[in-house]
A protein has these predicted regions:
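Juxtamembrane transmembrane-helix boundary signature
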Residues: 60-81, 112
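Membrane-interface helix caps of multi-pass small-molecule transporters
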Residues: 40, 65, 69, 90, ...
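Hydrophobic/aromatic residues within the transmembrane alpha-helices of Major Facilitator Superfamily
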Residues: 25-32, 62-65, 69, 150, ...
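Membrane-embedded alpha-helical modules
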Residues: 95-209, 322-433
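Loop-to-helix transition at the N-terminal end of transmembrane alpha-helices
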Residues: 46-62
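Residue-level signature of catalytic and energy-coupling elements of molecular machines
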Residues: 21, 41, 125, 194, ...
Length: 433
């Protein structure tokens, strides 16, 4: 107990070991779905799901432990939703890069992220990007996740006449996905910890009876991480065509992680004078996790908004995060269960997360068309072009153009002009490629 007090200063934060552990378990239950969802998504890129499962558990444990031990923050880290889908379905699936090259792009973005954090530029860059575009990025990624979820569940299918259409609702996967989604929403309404995780497990169990899935056991030694460990192709990622991808990874990581860290830390009462040094340490731990995750073999790692659940349960120190880290390490031994989770079992989780992300629409300034229109353009272009980068590009270009032609150019930060110019040059030079 004395060691824990010395490490985490529990009394100074008005908490105790029991409260911190309960908070850690609460946070873990709200985000444990990622150990099933991330391998499922990255498998679509051709990555070995067993190795990705191990990489997911390890980076979640290592990143969260560093957040707890180094920054003494009750915030958990894991591979982020949205960028994993962009990695698999766009960078690899649509653009044709290998997953090794895509990991190289994540590595480079992680190095950039680490550099701007070390030099104190992270907050400066974030403040230079319009709030409307920061908000729209979250909304657009939510819509992007939604269409992926509906496709994975078989609810939406391709159509030569209308691009997309309704799938066959009589198929068992569609029905099971719908049941899983309703279950998640109902459990969330009643504030049941681990609602998303329960939904995934429930649909997986149903798949054994109605989907032809086969139970492969529950516990086993962790699979090998060798197929993904240090398999990144950095030289391939340095080629001109993929630099656009690096920029997307970098920008989304920047806004998502920084916003989450600030939001959760503020709720925990940690963003006050005298405690900002710890926030800077949290930024560094978060940045290092992206770098490390690419080496292990997973898409970008980020701070999880679900950490707010642990803060709500009383978590105030890094002991909460360390508890989460230990639980992620324990998950290494349930690989047989993770290996039989079908895509239509994780689809309800994706769709629910997408629904939650759309609430950010209320943050847009609907009284100023020069703010709301670029935001909406950003959000809409992501799912409709099936590419997060295109949404960002059209959003920044539209924002700069509208401000310029309405006499509000002075309102635009220099960082926004630079990003808009980069995207415009890319479109002029490469078109829609």
């Amino acid at each position: 107990m004395q060691l824990l007090e010395k490490l985490f200063k529990l009394k100074a934060h008005g908490t105790n070991v029991r409260t911190e552990i309960v908070a850690g378990v609460t946070t873990f239950l709200t985000m444990a779905y990622i150990i099933f969802v991330n391998p499922s998504i990255l498998a679509a890129a051709g990555m070995p799901p067993d190795a990705v499962f191990v990489a997911t558990c390890l980076i979640a444990a290592l990143g969260t432990a560093s957040m707890g031990l180094y920054a003494n923050y009750p915030i958990a880290l894991a591979p982020g939703m949205g960028l994993n889908a962009y990695f698999a379905f766009v960078v690899v699936g649509a653009m044709g890069y290998t997953w090794q090259t895509a990991l190289g792009a994540v590595f480079i973005s992680g190095c950039l992220f680490l550099a701007i954090t070390l030099f104190g530029l992270r907050e400066l860059i974030v403040r230079g990007i319009p709030q409307s575009l920061r908000t729209a990025i979250v909304v657009g990624i939510g819509m992007f996740l939604a269409i992926i979820a509906l496709k994975s569940a078989g609810i939406v299918v391709a159509s030569p006449a209308t691009l997309v259409t309704l799938g066959d609702l009589h198929k068992p996967p569609v029905a099971m996905a719908a049941i899983g989604f309703i279950l998640i929403v109902v459990l969330d309404k009643y504030r049941v910890p681990g609602a998303i995780l329960i939904g995934i497990v429930t649909v997986t169990v149903m798949s054994f009876f109605f989907g032809g899935n086969k139970f492969a056991g529950l516990f086993a030694a962790p699979p090998s991480i060798a197929p993904t460990f240090m398999q990144l192709d950095i030289s391939g990622a340095l080629k001109g065509g993929i630099l656009n991808v690096v920029l997307v990874f970098f920008l989304v990581e920047l806004f998502d992680a920084t916003g989450t860290l600030m939001g959760v830390a503020k709720r925990a009462g940690l963003l006050v004078p005298g405690k900002m040094e710890r926030f800077n340490k949290a930024l560094l731990a978060d940045s290092a996790a992206i770098f490390a995750g690419s080496l292990l073999g997973t898409s970008s790692t980020t701070a999880y908004a679900e950490s707010a659940a642990g803060v709500q349960a009383g978590g105030r120190t890094g002991l909460t995060a360390v508890t989460v880290a230990v639980l992620f390490l324990a998950c290494l031994f349930i690989s047989p269960l993770a290996g039989v989770v079908p895509a239509y079992a994780t689809a309800p989780a994706l769709f629910f997360v997408a629904c939650l992300m759309l609430r950010e629409l209320t943050e847009l300034n609907w009284d100023d068309s020069t703010e709301v229109v670029p935001g909406v353009v950003t959000a809409l272009m992501m799912p409709f072009t099936y590419n997060i980068a295109n949404g960002l590009a059209f959003g920044f270009i539209t924002y700069a153009a509208l401000k310029l032609f309405t006499g509000k150019a002075k309102e635009v930060h220099w960082m926004t002009w630079i990003i808009a110019a980069v995207f415009l040059a890319k479109f002029i030079y490469m078109g829609g490629e």
